[in-house]
């Protein structure tokens, strides 16, 4: 069983957590290809492409310019600890022990516009490149064209290692759409988190992102 998450726009690179284990992204060379192209864009190009403010465009221009290999714990951070949005606040990965981290490493994947698909302990450097960005590249007109085959094949390779071949989709449509579902060798379970309010079930975005269920889906104490 594998659970899929979207990345977070909010990042935390201000301090390093006490986790020494790390891995490298499976598609670091492909990420480098996108970075090389992104480095040729101006701040105005990024503003127009990503529909972001001047300050964010300048920040991400700086991030792209500073992005460099090889990754190590001095210049990068594990993905599960670097992402800091609502989902990851609810996940509370900073509290994971060694067994929890190992289980998450096998059962959790994070879809990414820059890195394709990440294991929790994969090192990343700061970036912003959403999957839905219409970023033309050598493979097509957007990031779906760039990543679809690689991400789908990677998930198929990993799900074959599991007895339970269910893929639990907790990612957004923007990210899940990168997967070629017709070629996916696993059963897909889509999730929607709602709350009972005022006599009916409602989708509350902030609380849904912090759903404790994410923790239940990734820790080895979970009963399937």
Residue ranges of predicted features:
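Anionic group-transfer/hydrolysis microenvironments
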Residues: 8, 171, 220
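C-terminal accessory regions
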Residues: 1-2, 214
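Active-site helix-to-loop segments that bind/position phosphate- or nucleotide-bearing substrates
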Residues: 4-95
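Internal, well-folded beta-alpha domain core
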Residues: 93-217
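Single conserved hydrophobic/aromatic residue that forms the stacking wall/gate
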Residues: 216-224
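A generic "cationic amphipathic patch" detector
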Residues: 18, 47, 124, 181, ...
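Charged/polar, solvent-exposed surface patches and flexible loops
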Residues: 29-36, 40, 66, 145, ...
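Glycine-rich nucleotide phosphate-binding loop and flanking beta-alpha elements
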Residues: 11, 174, 223
